[in-house]
């Protein structure tokens, strides 16, 4: 990877954000109804980010605040944007650089007075040595993890739907009991 210094000249590209939970996402997908996309007066000078670039929030690399971008857009000037110098599987690197071993290395090589002030500067990032398999193996690993992650995400969605329905059921039960639709007698329920 080599650090990209390209900056937005117009500031009209999609604004990207970096999350410890999801990696690089479109900022507009994470903005609530009453929130602003940004407080910045202008996005001119924000760092350009291409699909496949590694984007690191240097203040949160130790907390998994990084990811390989699936988007073309712009990122905060305080982020580091790195472009791969050889052919890589972006999905593999997204998984590899966000796993526990890599995060521990980022934390160990970050500088700062206290944990909440740690920063992973480019010279420290370049000094890291992370094992990387050949491209065909990267592709196989990424495909396997993508497939398994998709299945797990579907299960999580199903469980979350069930939880939502159970909460509704509880709400309805409470309403029915307190409004007298269901009569409760000592030691049990009388319908």
Feature locations, PLM:
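A short beta-sheet element
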Residues: 46, 51-103, 108-110, 114-115, ...
């Amino acid at each position: 990877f080599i650090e990209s210094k390209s900056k937005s000249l117009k500031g009209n590209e999609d604004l990207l954000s970096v999350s410890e939970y999801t990696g690089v996402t479109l900022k507009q997908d994470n903005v609530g109804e009453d929130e602003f996309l940004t407080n910045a007066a202008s996005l001119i000078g924000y760092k350009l980010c291409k699909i496949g670039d590694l984007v690191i929030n240097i203040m949160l690399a130790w907390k998994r605040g990084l990811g390989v971008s699936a988007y073309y857009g712009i990122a905060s000037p305080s982020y580091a944007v790195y472009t791969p110098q050889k052919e890589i599987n972006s999905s593999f690197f997204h998984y590899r650089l966000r796993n526990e071993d890599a995060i521990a290395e980022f934390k160990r090589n970050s500088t700062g007075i206290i944990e909440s002030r740690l920063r992973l500067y480019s010279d420290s990032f370049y000094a890291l040595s992370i094992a990387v398999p050949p491209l065909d193996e990267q592709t196989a690993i990424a495909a396997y993890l993508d497939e398994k992650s998709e299945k797990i995400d579907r299960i999580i969605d199903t469980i979350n739907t069930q939880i939502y329905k159970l909460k509704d059921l509880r709400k309805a039960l409470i309403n029915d009991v307190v409004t007298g639709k269901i009569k409760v007698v000592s030691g049990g329920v009388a319908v």
